[in-house]
């Protein structure tokens, strides 16, 4: 008798969209492209000693509520404007929880917080143009 020993915990399969498909569905806007380009140049100048400011990278570690994350980003942007001569503030957020072995795995893996694991929805949600164009 042959015993089933492989993939014993798999309960179903769902195809994950390739990255190029997500990128084609949600192209980056000119406004966001400019923000990323300019921010990277500023950070490079600071790290190479061409500026006296400090780069400050702040969380949250991961997000589960995109609207709350946008509100937080707006507050950081206001703070950065107030401290622009001293600091370059960068918001860093994970959409996954790479070190989590139990529990919720992050917005990409379970966007509805219901163990549905709709990765395609999660990828579209975190790359959605509506939040990215608000700052």
Can you annotate each of these PLM segments?
Residues 1-14:
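Polybasic, low-complexity association/targeting segments
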Residues 14-47:
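N- or domain-start disorder-to-order transition segments that initiate the globular core
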Residues 52-54, 85-87:
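Short, well-ordered coil/turn segments that N-cap beta-strands
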Residues 56-58, 89-93:
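Hydrophobic faces of well-ordered beta-strands that scaffold small-molecule active sites
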Residues 62, 93-99:
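Active-site-proximal loop/turn and secondary-structure-junction residues that shape catalytic pockets
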Residues 64-80, 119-125:
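Glycine-rich anion/phosphate-binding loops
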Residues 102-121:
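A charged helix-plus-loop insertion that forms the helical arch/lid used to bind
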Residues 126-135:
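Single conserved hydrophobic/aromatic residue that forms the stacking wall/gate
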């Amino acid at each position: 008798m042959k015993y089933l020993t492989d993939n014993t915990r798999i309960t179903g399969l769902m195809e994950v969209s390739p990255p190029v498909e997500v990128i084609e569905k949600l192209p980056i806007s000119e406004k966001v492209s400019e923000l990323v380009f300019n921010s990277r140049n500023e950070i490079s100048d600071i790290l190479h000693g061409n500026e006296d400011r400090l780069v400050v990278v702040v969380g949250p570690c991961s997000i589960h509520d995109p609207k709350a994350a946008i509100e937080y980003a707006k507050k950081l942007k206001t703070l950065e404007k107030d401290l622009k001569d001293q600091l370059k503030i960068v918001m860093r957020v994970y959409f996954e929880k790479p070190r989590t072995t139990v529990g919720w795995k992050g917005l990409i893996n379970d966007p509805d917080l219901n163990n549905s694991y709709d990765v395609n929805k999660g990828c579209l949600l975190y790359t959605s143009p509506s939040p990215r164009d608000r700052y």
